[in-house]
Regions:
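Active-site mouth loops of central-metabolism enzymes
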Residues: 28-44, 97-107, 189-199, 253-256, ...
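Glycine-rich, proline-tolerant flexible connector loops at the mouths of alpha/beta enzymes
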Residues: 60-80, 99-100, 219, 351-363
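Alpha-helix-loop-beta-strand connector modules within alpha/beta enzyme cores
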Residues: 74-95, 368-379
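Conserved, mostly hydrophobic/aromatic
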Residues: 3, 53, 65, 84, ...
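N-terminal beta1-alpha1-beta2 module of alpha/beta enzyme domains
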Residues: 1-88, 190-191, 389-393, 401-413
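Hydrophobic faces of well-ordered beta-strands that scaffold small-molecule active sites
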Residues: 3-7, 61-63, 93-96, 124-128, ...
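Acidic (Asp/Glu)-rich catalytic clusters
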Residues: 54-55, 81-90, 113, 117-124, ...
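An alpha-helical appendage that flanks or caps ligand/catalytic pockets
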Residues: 4-34, 147-182, 223-346, 375, ...
Length: 413
């Protein structure tokens, strides 16, 4: 099992009352509320936490990016990945990920990722995402072409990594007269690609066709089983049997020396969900064309008050009761994690350990307890349950490189 640490890197040093007063904290919430002095301090603390995670034995650091909102300070995941490539020695640098539809030049992105892979001596995992709905608006990208741009940018990046240049690319959304990057990944044929997501069936099917691991982002156990069913069926149709090496899960788990402290800090997971801030208007987050028509309709009905939030709005107590948030001492959370592993069988587990206004000191304590008391037990259970990571299973990077297919595949599509 591959065990990694994650935090959204929240810009928590702003007046949350202003967000509540405005009614949203994404897209149009003014950046006059951003404090660069506090931002500089927070960036330093997050870097210290990542370096400490490596020191206590954590396998990987998961990074992401978001835009125009305080819940995530990473405007470019590749920047922190570059820093970690030069300041760490062992941990995998897992980008989940670069929002491909927002990229106007995928070749530049391919070059950046290749540099990170070389500087880190082959420790990059390059995940790709579609980007949030409001981020399409922020960058001026037509959300109706989101999936087309995602798939075409992916294909162009992979070709730039694997096919010697120069060659020409004349696509629907990207045109390059000369593709010939003089920066190529150290890992061959190219760095592993993992695909995170929540509810998009189209993305699950696409990932399975590519044979890329799919990382379920804190979905419920029943939802996660539905995801694996769709993935497994797609994999079987593509000619291979999927397993734990194709499955990842992001869980919100905060550990502390006492249960009282853990509960106090874990309540900060509600910070991003709008209990303390506000987040985006549903129509901004789900612009026309971004979701399938049925998904779009459910969010619009919610926005105008005709229906409940399709993603639900459970309280902290409800999420703790059903395992969506786990908190306590290591001994208290381990049985709940064991249940999660038995039910969802992931070969990749990302622990979202800290959020909101959790102090730097408490964040470091959580990381220490994860690395020294929680993860060692999880590794033993993973061996018992046969939960191999893609690295342990030596899974192919892409279906195009598979040697175990029940029927030949010309290329991943």
């Amino acid at each position: 099992m591959h065990l990694m640490y994650f935090t959204e890197q929240p810009m928590s040093a702003y007046d949350a009352k202003e967000g509540l007063k405005y009614g949203a904290t994404a897209l149009t919430f003014s950046n006059k509320h951003f404090d660069p002095v506090a931002g500089s301090r927070l960036y330093g603390e997050y870097l210290e936490q990542y370096i400490y995670a490596e020191q206590v034995g954590i396998d990987g650091i998961m990074l992401n990016e978001h835009h125009n909102a305080p819940f995530c300070m990473q405007a470019k995941a590749n920047i922190f990945a570059s820093v970690l490539a030069g300041t760490t020695q062992r941990v995998k640098i897992v980008l989940l990920g670069n929002p491909l539809p927002l990229a106007e030049n995928p070749i530049r992105l391919a070059e950046e990722l290749a540099m990170i892979d070389m500087i880190s001596k082959g420790r990059l995992v390059s995940g790709f995402v579609r980007g949030g709905g409001q981020e399409q608006r922020a960058t001026g990208v037509n959300p109706a072409y989101n999936r087309e741009r995602f798939e075409e940018a992916h294909d162009l990046i992979v070709k730039a990594w694997t096919v010697p240049g120069p060659f020409r690319w004349e696509g629907t959304h990207y045109q390059h007269r000369v593709v010939n990057p003089w920066a190529l990944p150290l890992q061959k044929p190219y760095p592993r690609v993992w695909i995170p997501g929540v509810i998009s069936k189209e993305t699950i099917i696409w990932a399975a066709k590519q044979r890329y691991p799919y990382i379920a982002l804190n979905t419920s156990i029943p939802q996660t089983k539905q995801i694996w069913k769709l993935y497994d069926d797609t994999a079987a149709a593509a000619g291979y049997q999927s397993g734990p090496e194709n499955r990842g899960y992001l869980a919100r788990i905060h550990v502390a020396e006492t249960e009282e402290k853990a509960i106090q800090n874990a309540k900060q997971f509600m910070w991003m969900q709008g209990e303390f801030t506000g987040l985006a208007h549903p129509v901004w987050a789900n612009p026309s064309g971004y979701f399938s028509p049925s998904g779009r309709r459910s969010f619009v009905e919610f926005a105008v008050g005709r229906a409940k939030n399709p993603r639900g709005n459970p309280t902290f107590e409800e999420q703790r009761a059903d395992g969506m948030i786990m908190c306590g001492t290591p001994k208290q959370v381990l049985p709940r994690i064991r249940h999660l592993l038995e039910e969802t069988r992931p070969g990749i587990l990302a622990v979202w350990g800290n959020d909101g206004n959790v102090s730097h000191s408490d964040s470091m304590t959580c990381i220490r307890l994860l690395g020294q008391e929680v993860f060692p037990q999880l590794r033993e259970w993973a061996k018992e349950l046969g939960l191999d990571s893609p690295f342990e299973a030596e899974a192919p990077v892409n279906i195009a490189y598979a040697k175990d297919l029940k029927r030949p595949v010309a290329a991943a599509g």
